[in-house]
């Protein structure tokens, strides 16, 4: 099935951290615990061929039952799960976003993308050389930690904005990210577009900078200036040439509308501009997916292999460059739509129906009163990163699909109250909890978002009724020896290319 040319969604329903330890190369991580929330966005077409995989523990069967109830009809389960795949001597991969990470390594190898070591860059900055550092990550990552003097120019914005920041061809441009992939892709984007400057990637990004013993900035707000008409004209022409050379085609709105009605093919419509531009107005139905992130984490946005992908950008530059990379990654049907719409807000993706949902709720005032007299036990089903950042005082962390085990560790009071980010996941889990406890079960209306909005206190004192296996952690987010974790991660990235070649599922090419 893999590589036969037809559409296929290969979905791993284990928790993300477990998924990250070993998984099939082209599998998408959609944990059973959040299946109803995430599946329809990643796999929207009900007739898609779907293969579900697990550890052979039966959770893929539970996922299949939910999907079948919601109209997905072409469902299979990988017999024997991950262990059977390994026993058949097929490759398994660790980490997340593996195809995108491997692609970055491939591009550096095939294109000879030049790079600069942290020590050399530090010396140039100290000597005030004619150099600019462009950080190709989203602003939230940049603001947490950045290279001194670095300006935030997220990946797909580089070709559009770099010449505005470095108008002199004598200025050296250094592109960085946290590790390797976005630095390489960002630098090579500028080279492919033909900027007259010397362009290099910062080898190993901010992690390499830290490992070399240099301090990063934090909390900075250096952003690219607005683009002049001349810069836009140059960038549009350059990006079009790159896109055309990679086989990216442009379409018009009638073509898009015809494809929306095509029930035989999956369509993804992504607005690859800056999120602020998206928020000000976009084509109806488009999902915000800044181009750099779409290339960096394609599997987080696109659940169906072989689907059509339409990239929207009124300036065309971001879509053209993003499309060129997706084509080189092996996505055959990638198109650019140069439009801007008036739609506001994210498109509403239908949440899949659960078999049963409890209707019993409490509001924030009621919950606060229950807690004040020790009459409620709160179980928080939010993602562990969010829980650890701040939660309802006294709340226990648990994962929905492991609720039976978690509840066995929690001393229950008069009422069990479930909460989650916005309450949606808690509603899905309520009936499951009711079958496990004798206490009445209620859901916090509006979830943790409502609690925060009402001004109630949050706590960071963790009560873990389950392990935090729901999320993979970046090296610098992990406890323990951070430097060792960074070195391990960078070595993992570099080692991907030969392993991808052995697997044989991906066919990359370079511009």
Where does each model-flagged region fall?
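Rhodanese-like catalytic fold shared by cysteine-dependent sulfurtransferases
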Residues: 1-9, 13-132, 136-268, 272-377, ...
